[in-house]
Amino acid sequence: MKSTLSYLLIICSLFTACIGHQEESLLFYVDTRTGTAPSATHTAELFGKNTEEYGQTLPAVLEPNGMNFWTPQTQDTEAKCKAPYYYKDTKIQGFRNSHWIVGGCTQDYGSMTLMPVSGTLKYLPQDRGSLFSHQEETATPAYYSVLLKDYSIFAEMTGRSRSAIFRFTYNQPEDAYLIVNPNSDEGKGYIEIDTIKKQIRGYNPVHRIYQGWGEPAGYNGYFIIEYQNEIEEYGTFRHDSLFAGQRQIADGTGIGAYLRFKIHSEGPILIKAASSFTDMEGAQKNLDTEIPHWDFDRTRQELNSIWEQRLSQVTVQTNNRNDKEKFYGALYRASFLPRTFNDVDGRYPSFSTGHPFRQSANGRNYYEDYSMWDTYRALHPLVNILTPKKAGDMMQSLVDKYEQGGWLPIFPCWNSYTAAMIGDHCISALGDAYIKGIRNFDINKACEGMLRNAFRTPATYEEYKNGMGRRALNS
């Protein structure tokens, strides 16, 4: 009897321990702001002052390897080496669906920014920025919130891969505005207001850097923003010029649109947003599929669950909280790239040209933004171990790029050929995936592309200048 009772007590203890372990939130160990301040090392001070001395990371809300990185914005630009957010900055200008190459010194692209304000209408990013305190920020992979002090607005953000939902509590509800910018540094953006559908829609054309610097990448970042409340005023702007009652504006830097909501009491306003690299219909379908409701807390819980599952793939056996924060924070930052590039229906722009639209295989994502010179040594081998199916999809995406563009890419970013670094690191990633037993990609076609890169060079200098072929290979 005693042995039976002891056995039952042991079983109960183990069960309780398992339950306790399962209930531990690993998100608790991740502060997404880590890496947004400058490094204190001597080497960082010598190299990349004001750019690469930073970790160039983001305090983003995202799905692991999702399309959009939903981030607060303190820097109004998509310029090279300028991340959307830095810890040292004192004002928040809005909330962006960023496609920043996290950890690098390249560019953001195809993004838009939205910002709630109240009182006097301030619409330019440099004018409307609000003071905030890091002590009043909550920054996790599934949820971000901050008090915008200048407007007494409590802003909250959560989302999914291609879409987000915002909850803005206007504590001073009179003159409650929403501002939206297509972030086109080249002055090629477009934005429109649809008061019937209660939407703001627009696009931001993507351009290249490195090979083909400044040239169009052949596609746009489309976005849709939806609101519930009635509005009392709307309009557009271009720099210092305000156009009240105008519904659309295009082709210029510093353009955007604004709404003034009809609210007369304190309380939250819900805003939904989504994007696509194919077209406006794709953005709408992404939003309708991922967040078909107006339940902020439901979406937050969905994303919480996704991240708990992601972080729980590795168990850190230590009671040292600092070690857990380092590890799970690093795993978060290892979950940005490559990004999902296709819509929920599988469509995406052709590699290198943008057209025609392609269709990914059923159940398979097409991935983009391989900062391969930085990631082939450690990130991709980690992906191969933790998520082999996803790793195979990433390798198939490289094969797709070879078939669509004619050459296996070296450093594919913004869905274009680039060759900023010498070497041929995609070959290393493909080889490591194969050695680790990953087979859910076209092995023969991958080998064909690898051999072509190794033994042939582009027929023309224009192709080589465009980023095709291996760098410094004798013809």
Predicted regions and their residues:
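Accessory carbohydrate-recognition regions in carbohydrate-active enzymes
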Residues: 21-475
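Bacterial Sec-dependent N-terminal signal peptides
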Residues: 1-23
